[in-house]
Amino acid sequence: MRQTADRLRRWRPGAIAVVILCAGLGFVAYEKFLARDISIYPDDEQNFKYGSIGNDGATGVPYAIWIVLPKVFPEYLPGPGGYASLGFRWEPGRTQSDAPLGFSRARVGVERMAINCAFCHVTTFRRALGAQLEFAAAGPGNTVDVLGYQNFLTACARDSRFSGDGLLPAMEQEVHLSWLDRLIYRYAIIPFLKKSLLRQAEQFKWTGQHERPPWGPGRIDPFNPVKFGMLRLADDGTIGNSDMLAVWNLGARDEVRADAPLHWDGLNTSVREVVLSSALGDGMTAQEYDKQTQASLRRVATFLRRTKPPASPYRPDPAAVNRGHVLYVKLCAQCHAVTGARTLTVIPVEEVQTDRHRIDMWTPAARDAYNHYRTGYDWNFSHFQKVEGYVARTLDGLWLLAPYLHNGSVPTLADLLEAPQGRPKAFVRGGEVLDSSRGGFVAPPCDPAHPEKGAFCFDTTLPGNANFGHVYGTDLTAADKADLLAYLLTL
């Protein structure tokens, strides 16, 4: 017994040391990999622009790495200017060291940069060339190149310089790293992120298959990634490329048609489900769907119900506006006015005759899979639906919704009033200078075979990019078109 007691006394200090060491390592592991701290914004608009949607741990890129990627790998960007070349924008008072619009900067172990709803839903515009940049929250993101960002991260991860030796010198010029930080980044975070980005690249291989055209700035295929990823449906070759949505003023729907779809795609009628499913599509996980994330998403929903589009800056000739209003009532109001009999209803694609690829992308199987999606949590989805057309939406904020049609295939309102054969066949997307005479953004013609470096040439002859259909008003006289355009510019 005495020998046993002696052995215990001799082992006790060592055992205590082991326990302390394990506890210390556990604490470090928790602090550097798991500890979560997200910023709380008192203002709902700031929360929409910069708040977390619960995807920081799953898809967020550590800030210390994210901030140096454009410096280490500039050749993988479409042009100079770092992330700005991908259409990212910073509000006044912020620098490129801060989070751009549409990114949360939250801590999950380390600080991470992750996209949020504003990544696709803030419009940036200038009233004239050289004028101050202005922002419209909840409008369609007209400059951001979502697939370009994904491809940039992929190209970086495939480069042999995506390593401790390749990244740490640049990182130490931007942020303070302790000796422990350097070890953790070198042997854990950088290798793990590289594998994660390469795995994500495999999940997006479908974007370059089946003759799918590139998205370009201000466009996205929002639901095929969900179909083939989260819902685990097979690649069916469909194309869902479409213009970014305006998501402002969702509460006004209740005044028009309470059970109507929320957007022109007709997919869902519930604000809660649209916000929640969007967060899931952007990488939110059940593990991060905690009270803070739930509160943030409720605030996003409230903001989208209440926020209004900015008033049109255009002041056309009042007489022309009055004449144009008469034409609008005759030709457009039935489907687009608040009091219209068909406003917020599904217009069959056979009638509107626009490109149907987006309709075919959303299959009954996808609808059913989303309504029954329960991975990790009972999300309680029940309002996803399949429609055979596009919803005729109200025209609030019309002056900022260019390019027009659901796939962004018509650059200006003036072009939309032309017969399809007279509309531009190819034009530059991603502009933010307003075209005050034609309605929309300045969008010069381009040659898809010889695009200008740094500019995205949108080719309407590619699958999913067609600019035909919606021929209402195209048979008016030139004078009547000018009057109708004058009225539309005020909306």
Set out the residue ranges of the language-model regions:
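Short, Lys/Arg-rich, polar N-terminal cytosolic tail immediately upstream
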Residues: M1-T4
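Periplasmic c-type cytochrome electron-transfer domains
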Residues: D6-L491
